A protein has these predicted regions:
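Hydrophobic core segments of alpha-helical transmembrane domains in multi-pass membrane transport
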Residues: 22-30, 60-68, 86, 102-106, ...
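Transmembrane helix-loop junctions in multi-pass membrane proteins
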Residues: 1-2, 30-41, 70-73, 148-162
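Membrane-interface alpha-helices at helix entry/exit sites of multi-pass transporters
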Residues: 93-97, 126-142
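Short helical (or helix-break) motifs at transmembrane helix termini and adjacent helical loops
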Residues: 108-121
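Core transmembrane alpha-helical segments of multi-pass membrane transporters/permeases
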Residues: 2-40, 54-66
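Interfacial loop-to-helix junctions that mark the boundaries of transmembrane helices
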Residues: 46-52, 157-168
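Hydrophobic alpha-helical transmembrane segments of multi-pass integral membrane proteins
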Residues: 22-25, 49-96, 102-110
Length: 187
């Protein structure tokens, strides 16, 4: 019983960083709401930038990678960008594709960010140098990010999620097979 009770304060201490990250994400979302980012972006997309509408998922993907990489949090990126995406693209298959681009980019940027809590915990858990751990993850992340970017470029032109998703999976499989052939030739 005593060991169980002693574990409570340690558990609370372990949760403090995660709670702080979520609080910062909520604060960042509140700031973007007060600034009116949703309305500004929606007006921009429906106005002067309407010609770029077909490239929107790819742009959202790149923006969310950059935002998550620089802030070190995918959840904060979700909180900032998903409301903006939903305001800019209110309905249809393009909404699903755009929100998935936002979420995929945020997780990608968070995964390769050296200031991400998950990256820090993974390198600490593996007991390896933090920057070395980040560098070992980058080749894998960049291959998947490149395939995802191409898929998000193609998605608006195929028109439906039910074609875009198998197309992206096929592109990823083809990329892996090509990489396997290239790397097999080196050994």
């Amino acid at each position: 019983f005593r060991d169980c009770m002693d574990a409570f304060p340690e558990g609370f201490k372990a949760m403090v960083p995660a709670i702080l990250i979520l609080c910062c994400a909520w604060t960042l979302k509140g700031v973007t709401d007060v600034l009116g980012a949703k309305v500004f972006i929606a007006d921009l997309i429906n106005g002067p930038a309407a010609a770029l509408f077909d490239f929107l998922p790819a742009m959202i993907f790149v923006i969310s990678i950059a935002l998550a990489f620089s802030t070190g949090t995918s959840w904060g990126t979700f909180g900032i960008l998903i409301p903006i995406v939903l305001a800019a693209i209110p309905d249809g298959d393009m909404t699903i594709i755009a929100v998935s681009a936002c979420m995929a980019g945020a997780v990608c940027g968070d995964h390769c960010s050296p200031i991400s809590d998950t990256t820090i915990m993974a390198s600490a858990g593996a007991q390896c140098n933090h920057i070395v751990h980040v560098n070992t993850q980058l080749p894998y992340v960049m291959v998947v990010a490149a395939v995802s970017f191409v898929s998000y470029l193609a998605a608006p032109f195929v028109g439906t999620v039910w074609i875009a998703l198998p197309l992206a999976a096929g592109l990823m499989l083809a990329t892996l097979l090509i990489l396997r052939l290239i790397l097999k030739g080196r050994t």
